[in-house]
Amino acid sequence: EKKFTSKGNIIGMGGSAGGLLMGAVVNQAPDLFLGIVMAVPFVDSLTTNLDHSLPLTVGEFDEFGNAKDKKEHFDYIFSYAPYNNIKKMDYPNILITTSLSDNRVLFDEPAKFTAKLRDYKTDNNLLLLKTEMNAGHGGKSGRDGAIEEIAVDYAFALKIAGKLNTWSWNIKINYHINIVSRLMGLAKINLLN
């Protein structure tokens, strides 16, 4: 109604269970999105739910159900689980981040999801997996670490929207960023060229 955006120009962002949402919607309606940013996404939700030895599985039955003991829960989770619903089709540009020390969404979930997506996607759009070696579920610690993660997400969004070619950007994504010019100033990027 307000025409803020249009089909194929949306960039969705979500982390953890929000990453689960992004994974589900990108499988169901990939043509709506220009890109997706998924931070520590819970994308292998069915496998995780079936493993009652994992620390958070049993405690999250109220939220996600118990696929191991209830067939209707299994069927429902399977219907939207991002990993289980990857199809041979075009996907938008996707940035996935994971953390090696994440004890909520183990790093192998996003890695496994990315590998399967690489095998199945039929397009040439970006599919990036960024692994933080010294971070947990909440990302890097400290102000600079949080700003760096935000900068990476926005640099990716600006890159796929075609805006990085018109500005002077130069961020080093894998290591140090010059604090994004006091939070939201201009910076430069190297990763996506």
Locate predicted features.
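Accessible peptide chain termini
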Residues: 1, 191-193
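Active-site-proximal cap/loop segments of hydrolase catalytic domains
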Residues: 1-170
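Short hydrophobic targeting helices and cationic amphipathic motifs
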Residues: 175-176, 186, 191
